[in-house]
């Protein structure tokens, strides 16, 4: 494929192992250090790239307080040893934060506002709880129900609207854990995971090389024993069919096609199109549908043209309606989350956008696929989507 000079290309993409939020392997590792380790690895893997050429480090993070506050991206840049001339910004689009980082860098490259960018995101949910310090404006009650701030309740509503059964959700979750476990055993995550120091249950320092949150023992029988967690007695969404709480980071090295050619680098893929969209906060999990439709239209594609899909599995009750309305439900085993999703791997909020994009690019390479879609829902009613094309 012939690239145009201002095409946006991905040179490399990595992530940390996903650690459990409660007493997990990264309980003694700060979010900035988890992030900086990935940035260092990107340049270790790509020595031809001069760090002085980096225009901006753009880092997604949702709860920007405590160790994740005060423009954490700048701390990540400095801790990673990037030159002081490299700028840095922290972005927040809730669950879509690090995918927004991809979009921000892509838009800059497309308009000639820089050639080399480092993007990514992190969330240490063990150190900074999801709702820590949140103070919601009471006036929002005029525009959305209070329950719209409770993601699990919105998943219950979306599932009910689309007739998603408890059994359907349990089966979806079992699949996620099974595929993630198989991918781990078969080494399919090896190219994307960067080993990072952490601590075992006894406090001994260890090198963490695989995801801690996958539960290979998950079965229909074990999930059937779980009670609904968000709407007791009447609900269907359980902890087992929700994305796992986890700590993790992910990162990408992006540049213009012109710069990649100048450096003699072979890109993994190019950004074909991008989109964000709003939806009713009460069914925030539906956001990938309008966002994906926008992105496909901008790329001049239909969903049939997409070879591989990574959908962030916030909840099974949310994922199934999205796949149904995108025309993918009958193609799940051929195209969707082939190495498992967030139900198994976890959803460290600010990390997930570049995490699912990283996994997508690796699956595309493994399957020799041409076009891939990464998309996710966003709290308070949004969706975000990116179409990638291998080059």
Curated annotation (Swiss-Prot):
Q: In which pathway does it act?
A: Lipid metabolism; fatty acid beta-oxidation
Keyword annotations for this protein, in alphabetical order, are: Acyltransferase, Cytoplasm, Fatty acid metabolism, Lipid degradation, Lipid metabolism, Transferase
Give the Enzyme Commission number. 2.3.1.16
Coiled-coil stretches are none
Catalyses which reaction(s):
an acyl-CoA + acetyl-CoA = a 3-oxoacyl-CoA + CoA
Q: Which residues cross the membrane?
A: none
Q: Show the active-site residues.
A: 95 (acyl-thioester intermediate), 347 (proton acceptor), 377 (proton acceptor)
Q: Where in the cell is it found?
A: Cytoplasm
Its main subcellular localisation, reduced to a broad class, is: cytoplasm
For this chain's UniProt record, which GO biological process terms are given? fatty acid beta-oxidation; phenylacetate catabolic process
The enzyme's first-digit EC class, named in words, is transferase
Q: What InterPro entries does the entry give?
A: FadA, Thiolase, Thiolase-like, Thiolase-like_sf_Thiolase, Thiolase_acyl_enz_int_AS, Thiolase_AS, Thiolase_C, Thiolase_CS
Q: Which PROSITE patterns match?
A: THIOLASE_1, THIOLASE_2, THIOLASE_3
Q: Which domain of life is it from?
A: Bacteria
Q: Name one GO molecular function term.
A: acetyl-CoA C-acyltransferase activity
Per the record, GO CC terms? cytoplasm
Q: Which family does it belong to?
A: Belongs to the thiolase-like superfamily. Thiolase family.
Role according to the record: Catalyzes the final step of fatty acid oxidation in which acetyl-CoA is released and the CoA ester of a fatty acid two carbons shorter is formed.
Per its UniProt record, what PANTHER family does this chain match?
3-KETOACYL-COA THIOLASE FADA, 3-KETOACYL-COA THIOLASE, PEROXISOMAL
Q: Quaternary form?
A: Heterotetramer of two alpha chains (FadB) and two beta chains (FadA).
**Record's protein name:** 3-ketoacyl-CoA thiolase
Q: Name the source organism.
A: Marinomonas sp. (strain MWYL1)
Q: Which gene encodes it?
A: fadA
